[in-house]
Amino acid sequence: MQPQLNFYPSGPETTTAMTGLERQITRSGLKQGFITPSFISRLVCSALLCISAVLLSPVKAAAPIAAGFETLQAADGTDKPLEVAIFYPTEAVPQEVDLGPFKLNIARGGAVAGQGLPLIVISHGNGGATLSHHGTAIALAQAGFVVAAVAHTGDNHADQSRAASMMDRPRHISRVIDHMLTQWSGKDHINATRIGVFGHSSGAFTALAIVGGTADLGRIAPHCQQRPGDYPCQLVARQPAGTAAMVAAMVQPDRDTRVRAAVVAAPALGFTFTQASLGAISVPIQLWRAEQDVVLPQPWYVEPVRAALPKPLDYREVPNAGHFDFLAPCTPRFAAMAPPLCSSQPGFDRVAFHREFNAAVVGFFRVALKP
């Protein structure tokens, strides 16, 4: 039995108070026509009924925030336009949508919800796509972030013509930021002082470069002579011009000072960074390492970055995780298409890990990009 809420006191204090009110009205000469003590009693009771109706009426809950979604192209100077997937907070109702081999719970074309929103640009790894980290992007959007996930020209699932040309990537990040702040239809919802970057593998190298990290590219050739089987060295070896020519053609990118925080997961070419090249980074960094990463194995990738970055550092190591466990959990269709990207160590639960991973990424950016 539900407890009864009593908004109608009927004790002696109430009776006395109402009788006194009636006497005052009578003495003041207002007891004329329908304004009688009984009318006042009914008036007071009506007021109490109105108050109780307000108190007992259900409060309309705020609409749950879903992930809105759209795609666009961002100009990149004389190069081909960049393909970008945008995720953002919306109050529209989401639906499960099939996008290629992925299933996303999104509200396509929903109105942007909120003002002063932070912007996160996602940089995928070698051969990746705009949807490689769609789970993390959706989690960020549901938490009130605008997310722009770029497909890097020449280094994506459909085009590997510039797979080893790492120095184009930071420029792509800057061009996407330019577009989001000046051209995107929802640009007025973004706070331009709250911009971060998320990167995995080659995207993590990109994130370090865009916040001021300077790679010593001269370290590539000797490292690859000693470890030709490392995945980055295999990429370099496939370049027609050879390692020396490729490195000579690379130009160090400029730092983009608009980027105020970075999440860096399993960074490629970590051995090219030193304390001198990373020590000047002044923005908060969250660094992730997969314990069972055989693509970028220790101690040549995450470890040099961890040692060189300024302290304190938000460093996370994931037990039993592999390099590709930072990618969104796979659908059965995608697992059949790309088994290496979807295979985890025995006993590792990628879905459960991503609940923790996404929460940690959201929490980091909330603090690092606090207005």
Tell where the protein language model's regions lie, with residue ranges.
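Short beta-strand/loop motif that positions the catalytic acidic residue
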Residues: 281, 287-289
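Short alpha-helix in the alpha/beta-hydrolase fold that links the catalytic acid
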Residues: 297-306, 330
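Alpha/beta-hydrolase active-site loop
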Residues: 163-188, 209, 221, 225-232, ...
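Domain-level recognition of soluble alpha/beta enzyme cores
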Residues: 62-122, 314
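Alpha/beta-hydrolase fold nucleophile elbow
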Residues: 188-199
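Short glycine-enriched nucleophile-adjacent loop
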Residues: 181, 204-216
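Short substrate-entry loop that stabilizes the transition state in hydrolases
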Residues: 109-117, 122, 126-158, 294-297
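Acidic catalytic loop of the alpha/beta-hydrolase fold
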Residues: 270-271, 292-296, 324
